[in-house]
Amino acid sequence: MTATATRHDWTLQEARELFNLPFNDLLFRAQSIHREHFDPNEVQVSTLLSIKTGACPEDCKYCPQSGHYNTGLEKEKLLEIEKVVAEARVAREKGASRFCMGAAWRSPSKKDMPYVLDMVRQVKSLGLETCMTLGMLKEEEAKELADAGLDYYNHNLDTSEKYYNHIITTRTYQDRLDTLDNVRKAGMKVCCGGIMGMGEDEDDRVGLLVQLANLPQHPESVPVNMLVKVKGTPLEDVEDLDPFDFIRIIAVARIMMPASHVRLSAGREQMNEQMQALCFMAGANSIFYGEKLLTTSNPEADADMQLFRKLGIRPEQREQCATEEQEEEAIAEAVEYEATRHMFYDATRESA
């Protein structure tokens, strides 16, 4: 079997051996495989919006939205559909090809589902790919989302099965795998990855990748997050992750899942340009673009554009901002619009 063949039978030992290759050898191998499947100078750009923030009943130790921890985050109601569509338009003008919507729920409620489905339809009508992360899904809920036109569903495994109970106790690893199975059955694409730097060891990091790569079908999108430590969460004082270990994980993900988009997700604000460039060299080819990821900071849009220009990178499917002048105009509009994020449902109902 060749090194670049799509496999679903990876062992932990094989993943360890990849991770521990000399750094230059690992990046060379990852970049070579990357070039067989993707344009090395093209990056898929997504924008992420929190459509319902805070008071989540889950106890994920990394998350400021958990109702179990005092992080100072105020609970907000489900955003108006009009507000979501307006944000999606701005994202499209900034060059995003995919618009992702996240809600701090254990799973979507029946009363909120019609609003969520309408969000999908209206964002889809703008010509954007759509992605949602709403917690666990039953088969019928997944089918409803697929019928509404949802392209991707995000549901991360977060870490290895071995380390999982150190991070989350309110839902099981199997619960997460069942949701992924329901998403696949409904015909949607899967966005699934994890978080590095939560106190896990090397085997947990590569173990997560083994779990992902041995799914019946590789996730189309694999977000690799670097922990953003938030005051008030149990992980606020965890030891920092070595940047080279993070880059190694990106490279191993690329080798093990050669045709998946590997996304630099949360934690990019803590990465300098050189680290991000090495991640792109290691095979990352997707980012979240915009000033915020749900509730945590992200590099400013103009900083991302400057980095892209330095590296000669172009966004996938970028049609709305063909010139530098249009890019700068769209960014200015987005920054101005950011100051008006106050339109929430006035209804007395609140989503838990």
Curated annotation (Swiss-Prot):
The keyword Iron-sulfur applies. Residues 41-268 form the Radical SAM core domain. It catalyses: (4R,5S)-dethiobiotin + (sulfur carrier)-SH + 2 reduced [2Fe-2S]-[ferredoxin] + 2 S-adenosyl-L-methionine = (sulfur carrier)-H + biotin + 2 5'-deoxyadenosine + 2 L-methionine + 2 oxidized [2Fe-2S]-[ferredoxin]. GO terms for molecular function: 2 iron, 2 sulfur cluster binding; 4 iron, 4 sulfur cluster binding; biotin synthase activity; iron ion binding. It is an enzyme of class 2 (transferase). NCBIfam families: bioB. This is Biotin synthase. The lineage of its organism: Bacteria, Pseudomonadati, Pseudomonadota, Gammaproteobacteria, Pseudomonadales.
